[in-house]
Amino acid sequence: MHIAIAGNIGSGKTTLTRLLAEHYGWAPKYEDVDVNPYLSDFYNDMQRWSFNLQIYFLNKRFQDVVDILNAAENVIQDRTIYEDARIFAPNLHSMGLMSTRDFENYKSLFDLMISLVKPPDLLIYLRSSIPNLVHQIHKRGRAYESGIRIDYLEGLNDRYEEWIQGYKDGKKLIINVDDLKFEENPEDFQKVLELIENATK
């Protein structure tokens, strides 16, 4: 079983990945943001580093999917390969932060990679409002995220909504997280578990 969690920056992907891995005894596959050599530079100069960052993420995400396909255990994944190509790169391109030449090159590489792997058994999308995202980002206090622009988050949210509505590659579950505090509230986490169990029947 491969379950993947998608959602904007600060939506709770990593937290839910950890909680589900602990609850079900699954292997977690986390997004490795702390060792990313481009992330801090990107937030300081998005236009200069956008292509480098997106290629780095695409490479790591493809390797993750290959590892998951070869794994003999159930895996819960924090962030999907789709989000890089369907959300982040197009958003950067539309904002003028990635050139058309780089974007077309990136899309071509993604199309090749995606033809070689299969989608997750269940895709969970964590839907969140911008105020909730901003609150969560400030709460966790990652230094490199302190300069995230609101218009950048808004653009991502719009693209997430468009993408998830059109997602037809496999089963999907949309969870509205603005009023769910699944880390602090066991009842909220139980609600999430029930939604997942119904979606995987």
Can you describe what each PLM-predicted range is?
Residues 8:
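P-loop (Walker A) phosphate-binding loop of NTP-binding proteins
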Residues 49, 53-118:
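Glycine-rich phosphate-binding loop used to anchor ATP phosphates in small-molecule kinases
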Residues 134-201:
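NTP-dependent small-molecule kinase module
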Residues 22-60:
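Conserved substrate/cofactor phosphate-moiety recognition/catalytic segment
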Residues 16-17:
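Post-Walker A alpha-helix
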Residues 5:
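Hydrophobic anchor at the beta1->P-loop junction of P-loop NTPases
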Residues 87-161:
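A glycine- and Lys/Arg-enriched "phosphate-lid" helix/loop adjacent to the NTP-binding pocket
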Residues 13:
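Conserved lysine of the Walker
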